[in-house]
């Protein structure tokens, strides 16, 4: 099912099989585990180039944020500018890097009761916005993780629908996104050999 959703939303590229991936989100340990899993799928989470690092560091992100790749942004970072900081981060990655794919992952439960604002609408807006600002530049996937809380699941359904309407495949876990990207890469490699 992961692969079918990816093919429904993304067109395989014959000229550039997917290998280089940027992970961006609030994960901590999740990002580390995902990096290992992606590597086992032959998807590289390599450090970003100096130009990208400089652009991200120029955003003056709060302490605790790592921008090397994965771009690990704690909740307080993603709450900056009411979540609009995600748009600036994505813009910096798109304008200074050439990843084959970007996977944005958000743990919805981590935002619950953390601060006076809920940045999720603006985080989703940032994901949707890059589809029109940088069309075809990199495959883009969204991972929305939750703990099964009914209210969170309702919000997750709403965010999933918005993303899908913009052509963004949405997964429950990073491993699902990695498997989908692997399927895309296999088709791209086949097309490249035709």
Residue ranges of each PLM-predicted region?
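Peripheral docking tails and interdomain loops at the edges
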Residues: 1-46, 118-194
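Short glycine-cluster motifs
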Residues: 17-115
């Amino acid at each position: 099912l992961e692969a079918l959703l990816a093919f429904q939303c993304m067109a395989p590229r014959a000229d550039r099989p997917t290998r280089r991936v940027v992970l961006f989100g609030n994960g901590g340990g999740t990002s580390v585990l995902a990096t290992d899993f992606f590597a086992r799928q032959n998807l590289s989470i390599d450090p970003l180039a100096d130009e990208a690092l400089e652009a991200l560091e120029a955003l003056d992100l709060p302490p605790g944020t790592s921008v090397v790749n994965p771009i690990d942004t704690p909740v307080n970072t993603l709450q900056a500018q009411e979540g609009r900081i995600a748009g600036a981060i994505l813009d910096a990655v798109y304008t200074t890097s050439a990843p084959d794919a970007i996977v944005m992952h958000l743990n919805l439960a981590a935002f619950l009761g953390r601060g006076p604002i809920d940045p999720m609408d603006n985080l989703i807006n940032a994901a949707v916005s890059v589809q029109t600002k940088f069309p075809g530049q990199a495959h883009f996937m969204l991972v929305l993780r939750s703990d099964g809380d009914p209210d969170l699941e309702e919000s997750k359904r709403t965010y999933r629908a918005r993303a899908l309407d913009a052509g963004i495949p949405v997964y429950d876990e990073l491993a699902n996104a990695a498997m989908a990207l692997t399927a895309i890469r296999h088709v791209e490699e086949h097309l490249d050999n035709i």
